[in-house]
C-alpha cells in the first residue's frame, strides 16, 4: 500500500474508536447553493466534519503515539470526498463498513489547482477562541514521504472571520453564526463559488477565502502531490453542553467543488499575514517572577529542587514547509513553550513513533513518583492578565508517546500567586500551580493519573509540560515570543533521594 493510502487508513480507522462523524442539516440554503454550483458546471460532493480521539486511537494500538493531543479541547477535521473519478482505498471502505460510516471521505485529501473545499454552516457557540486552520500534512521528497503537519498561512479565527454577526469581519458576535469559507488556490473558482452562494441567499459579507497558495504547494491528484487537511479548533466553551452538541452534530456541511470542464487558472498569491507583536512586552515582570521563584524555593527549602528548562516548542508552519520537517500542527494564532531545552527540527515519516525521536525530551528524564514530597510547581506570567493572550494553558504529557492527560487553563490561575507574594501588587499578573500524584484536596493542584494507556502516565514514564498561549487581541494573531516572559517549572523531590 502506498504511503498516501497508509495515511488515510489510519485517520479513518480512528473513527472506530472515537465518536461518529457529524453532518450538518440539509437546509434549504445549502441545497440551493449546491444546485447553483451544479448549474454553473461544478461537480459537488458532500463531505462531513468529525473529530478524532487520538488517545483512544493510541490505546487501540492503531498508532504508536498520541501526537500531542490537546486535552483541553476537541478539534474537528474536514472529511472530504476524493476528487471525481478517484476513490478511497477499498481496505478503508471495508474498515468503515461496520459502524455505517461512508468509506468515501477522508481527513487527508489532495486538491487540484482548480478545486475548492467549502464550509457552509454555523460557527461554534460562544467560546474563548476558535479558528479554521489549513494544513499541509505530508509531502513527497523523491521516494520519501515526510510528515509536515504544518499550517500554511494565518488561521481564520474568531477575531477576523466574516459571519452574519461580524459582516466583513467587523467587530460583533462571531459565535453560532452562518458563514461560508471557500478553501481554494484559484481566484476564478473562488469568484464563481461566491456567486453561487449569493444566488442561494448567503451574504457576501459572511464569505471568507482560505487561500491554498500554489507557489509553495504541490497541488494535484498524483501520488507525489501534497496531502492537506483543515481543522476547526474551538476552545473553552461558555456553555459546555452547547459545545459538546456542536462537536457531536455540527450544523455545517463540507463540500468538494470540482469544475466539470477545464478552466483558465488564476492562482492566488501567498496571502498577507497578520504581524505578531505590539512593541509592549511582559518583560518588566521578570523581577516579580524571580521574586516568585525565590518564594517557591523558600517554601520548599527542605526538598531537593530541579529547575526545568523552557523553550519554544514547535517551528512556524512556513519554516517547517521550507525545511521539510515536522511542525506538530501549530497555528499562527499561538505561541508554544515546553519544558525542554530546544525546539524540534526533525524530518519524520507519517505517523512516526515519537519515542524514537526527540531524545532531548527524555534525557535527563523527568518522572513523577507518588511520594508526598515529590511534585512539580508550574509558575509564570498569566498571559491573559497581561493582555498578551485570549486564553492560555499548560498540559501534562508523557514525553515518549506525547499523550496529554490533563490541561489547566488561565481560568484556574487567578489569585494563585498572592499567597507567595502577599505584598506585591504585580502578583495578580502571576500564577502558581502544583502537579502531583496525590493533591490531598489542594484546589490549586492537578493530579496526574496513573496507567500504561494513553489516559495516564506511569511512575517511571518521563513527562513534559507544554504551554499554549493563544491569540493577542491587539494583533488578532499569536503573541510574539520576544514580548512574553517564558513560563517555568520546578521539580521537587525528597531531600533524601539520591
Residue ranges and their predicted role:
Residues 1-8:
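Bacterial N-terminal signal peptides that target proteins for export
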Residues 11, 15-19:
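Hydrophobic core
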Residues 23-498:
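A compositional/structural signature for long, glycine/proline-rich flexible linkers
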